[in-house]
C-alpha cells in the first residue's frame, strides 16, 4: 500500500514548491491534494490565473509519481483536465465524461470522476513532463482550479 503525504497539513513555502513526500512502493511518490471550497476560501493568483478551494494550488511531481485527490468538502467535486490550456479558460466545455474516472496526468483528457464528500480518487499517474491545468466540473466558475507541473 502506498504511503502518502497529506499536503493540507504541510505549510506551503513557495506556491509551487515540491512538498516533502513519502516514497511509495511503486515507481514514485504519491501526492495527496485536498479539494474544499469551505476550507480553502482565500483566492490565490498563480501563473495560469486565480484559484480557490485546492490545496496545494500548484502541485509539483515527477514522471512516475501519482496524485490522489481527496474531497474534504460537503459537496461533490472533480479534478478534470483543461486540454491544451496555458491559462484558465472562461468555459472548459467539459462533457459528462468529467464525471467518470479517466486517464493519466498528461496532455490527454483525464479526470478523477465525481468525488463524493470524503471520497479519495484513484491514483492518477504523471506520465509526461509538462504543465497541466485542471478544475472542478461543478465549481469551476467559483474558481476551483489548480495546476500540476510534471518534471522529468
Task: List PLM regions with ranges.
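Bacterial N-terminal signal peptides
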Residues: 2-9
Amino acid at each position: 500500500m502506498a504511503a502518502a503525504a497529506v499536503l493540507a497539513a504541510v505549510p506551503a513555502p513557495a506556491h509551487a514548491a515540491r512538498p516533502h513526500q513519502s516514497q511509495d512502493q511503486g515507481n514514485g511518490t504519491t501526492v495527496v491534494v485536498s479539494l474544499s471550497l469551505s476550507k480553502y476560501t482565500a483566492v490565490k493568483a498563480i501563473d495560469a490565473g486565480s484559484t480557490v478551494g485546492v490545496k496545494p494550488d500548484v502541485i509539483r511531481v515527477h514522471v512516475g509519481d501519482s496524485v490522489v485527490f481527496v474531497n474534504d468538502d460537503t459537496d461533490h467535486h472533480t479534478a478534470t483536465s483543461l486540454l491544451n490550456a496555458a491559462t484558465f479558460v472562461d468555459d472548459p466545455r467539459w462533457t459528462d465524461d468529467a464525471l467518470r474516472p479517466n486517464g493519466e496526468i498528461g496532455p490527454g483528457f483525464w479526470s478523477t470522476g465525481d468525488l463524493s464528500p470524503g471520497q479519495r480518487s484513484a491514483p492518477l499517474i504523471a506520465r509526461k513532463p509538462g504543465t497541466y491545468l485542471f478544475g472542478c466540473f461543478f465549481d469551476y466558475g467559483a474558481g476551483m482550479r489548480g495546476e500540476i507541473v510534471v518534471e522529468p
